[in-house]
Amino acid sequence: MINYQDILNASDPKVIFLKCERHVIEDADYRAMDGLNQSYLKKVYTHGVPHAENQRLNPMEKTPALVMGSLFHTLVLEEDQFSSRYAVLPDIDRRTKEGKLLYAEFEAAAGGKDLIKEADLNTAMRMRDSAVPLMYEGIRPDKTNAMNEISYSGILEIEYKWEGEDERLELPFKIRCDMVALVDEGNGKVIEIRDIKSLASLSDSDVIGSAKSHLWSMQCAFYRDVVFAHEPKPSKFVYVATEKEAPNMSRRYVCSEEMYQRGRAQYKHALVKYAQWLKAGKPSTADYVGESILNA
């Protein structure tokens, strides 16, 4: 049985990136690659490995919110892919028999594309117009100092102590960055890893709430460390957040050093959980949960 308290009390783990490669590949090819990604590690950190495995094996169906987020992402970073991914619904009343038939015909003709309403497209385009100036700030017109939708993969080694014994395990990893840019800052150049987010609003409560609940800190740290392993230069992580509600404003959020360090501790914690799960023979949920001391 794996005791969560043992994980909490484990010595500070050490992560070494043994191999790190950069890839210019399509999203489908990235998804097919083997490796732990930030979404999986977040689930391990918050819920445990069995939940992360269940999420991996049973991907969540696309909700309207997910489609909207993906649409916004495409318009900002891959606008040339819009027509191959989305079909704009005509004005159809699906409450009527005729409307249901027309919708079914349109869906079949779309050939698997995501169906979006014209009103949602208009909102996403306003969001795009707001986000693009910030997302591409400092990027040359020919974009030679930036790469969109860039992937990295490799092998990392996690070292830690468990019940007084030294443990070591090599694990595959992968990340996909919205943008990696080399920008001028002060007397030198800095790598900026930029990620776009769509939020209900840019109120402090919405931004901080989303950052905490979705562990932006872990993504920031994991991505910075992976990119540094490939190219050891000063870097920072920037979120460009855009609100879904009018007037659809955008803002840059630069992750602090404290947030980065917190994220490093989080992803290392998740790696220890995963490593011990593997060493224990991939136990079932019931065997894995164990007992923890709660001091909430």
Residue ranges of model-derived segments:
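Metal-dependent nuclease catalytic regions and adjoining charged, substrate-binding loops involved
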Residues: 2-7, 210-217, 222-296
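Surface-exposed cleft-lining segments at the edges of enzyme active sites
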Residues: 159, 165-166, 203-212
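A residue-level signal for conserved active-site and pocket-lining positions in enzyme catalytic cores
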Residues: 72-73, 179, 267
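Metal-dependent nuclease catalytic cores that hydrolyze phosphodiester bonds in DNA/RNA
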Residues: 1-174, 289-292
